[in-house]
C-alpha cells in the first residue's frame, strides 16, 4: 500500500530512483533533479507513482513471460527495463494501468512499446519489427502519452459504459468541441438575419474561393473575409456598396467570422479523473447524436484539457473490427470453429497468394485498384512487404514504389551508402521508408541519443530548417568520429532531408497492416464467412452490397436471396457454404420485424407456410409493409404454391392476397 511505501522509503530513496537512469547512473545535477521532482508533483506524489510503477512492472513481467518466454533474452529484458523506467520517471504508470484495464486493440505509436505489448495493449512485437519506444514516449520531449484505442462499432459503447461504471459517472467526461463560423457561413448567417435576398447571399458565397492567390511575398494568405476582400474586386465593391443591407452583411460577417457558432462532442476523446472531474475543469452536458442521451462533457476543448494536466483517452470505433467480429461469428455458427484472430499464422500461404493475385476487394487498407496493381507486381512474400506497401502507398512516397518492386525482384541493384546501413534498410531493399529507420540510423552512424534521434525525426518531418541546420554538424562530426567519409555523410543527410517529410510512422503502418492481414487471412481461408461479414456491415448501402456480390461471384460463392427459414438479420452462411441474404438488408423491412420473426423461429421451429407465419408473429411489429417487402424479395419462395406477384395482385373484390393474409393473421 501507499502507507507502507511511505514507511519504508525515504525522500532520498525516491530522489535517486526518479533522477537516475534505469541502471542507477546519475544523469542530472541535484538542482535539475529537484526541478524534475517538483514537476512530477513533489515527493508526496512520488510515493503514489512508485506504487503504481511497481504494480505496472509486475503486470509487464508476467505478460513478458507469455509473449517472449522465460527467461527473457538480454535485449528484451533491457528494453522492458528501460521502458518501465521512463514511464515511471515521467509519472505515467497510472495511465498505462488504466489503459490495459479497458483495452482491446491499441494502435499508433504505442505499438513501439514492448511494455504495451506485454500488457496486451498492442498485438505487435515492437522488438521484432524495429518499432521505437521513444517514437511514443521520449524522455527529452515531455508530452502526454497518446494511445488511440480501436474498438468494433458495437463494442465501443459498451466499453465507455463499463469505464463510466468502474470509475464513477462524476469522474469521467466526454470532451466538448466548438464549431466556429467559417467565411461563407458567416455571410449566410448574417444575410439571413439582415433579410438579404437569398440569390444575393448565394452570389456572395460563390465569390469566396477555396484558396486565395499567392501574395507579393509568394505566400498564400490565410483564408478569411478580410483577405478575400483584398483579393476579390467584387467583394470590395460589396463592402462599399450603396446598398446598406449588402454593406452591413459584409461588415457584420467580418466581425462574426471565427466566433463560436455551435458545440458538439469529440468523436472519441474521453477524460478519466481520480477525483470529481468538476474539481479540475468546468463541466456541462451535451446530447449524443446517435442515442439522444445527455452526456457529461468538459467545457474545455482537447488542447486546453492537456494544459490542465488531465489525460485524454481516445476510444475509436473501427468498422473493420466489426467486420472481423461478424466473420468470426459466422465461422462459429456455420463451421463450429472458435478462431482466435490474434493467434493466426503471419506466414499463411493462402493469404499471401490472395495479395499476390490482387484479390483484395473487401479487405482493409489494400483494396484500391492502384494498390491491387502494385500488389500483383510486387508479389509480397513477407509481412514486412505489406508494412512497406502500406507506408509507401500515399502521395509523395508513391514515386518510390516501382523502385521498391524492382529491387525485390532483383531488377535493380540494392545499394547502401555505408555497410552498417544494411541492418536497418534490408527489409525495405535499401530504401528509407519509415521515420524509425532515420532514427535508428542516426544512432548507428553518428551516435545520436534516443532523444536526439526523435528530435531529428520531428525536425525532418516538419521541415524545421533552423533545427536541422543546428543538428547537421553533430551528424557529420559523429559520423567522422566513427570513421565515415564526410562526403558520404553529406549525401545521406541530403537524402534524408528529401525523403523524411514523406517517411511514415512504422508503428502506425505495422498496426494497420496487421488488421489488414487479418481481413485478408479470413477472406483467403473462410471466404463465405468473411464476405458475409463485410456485406453485413454495408446493409444500408445497396451499391456496395451489389459490388460485393459481384466479388463473391468471381470467387465462386453463391449469394442467395432472403429466405424466411434460413436468413438472419444480417448476411449469413448456410450449410452448403453459400451466403444467404439478410432480411435486414431488404428495403422496407425494419429490424424489429426481423427480430420478431427470428425469435419466434428459434422458439417454435421453422415456418411451414405463410399462414403459419402470420399466425405466429406479432403483426403490429411485423406489419403488412414488412411482409410485402419480404414477399417481393423472395423470402417466401421456398413455401411454393404462390408466386411473388400474387401477393400484391388484387382479386375480384379489390383485396390482395396479402390483405387477406394479414386479416387472417
Regions found by a protein language model. Give the residues of each.
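Alpha-helical scaffold/interaction cores of sigma-54-like transcription cofactors
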Residues: 1-665
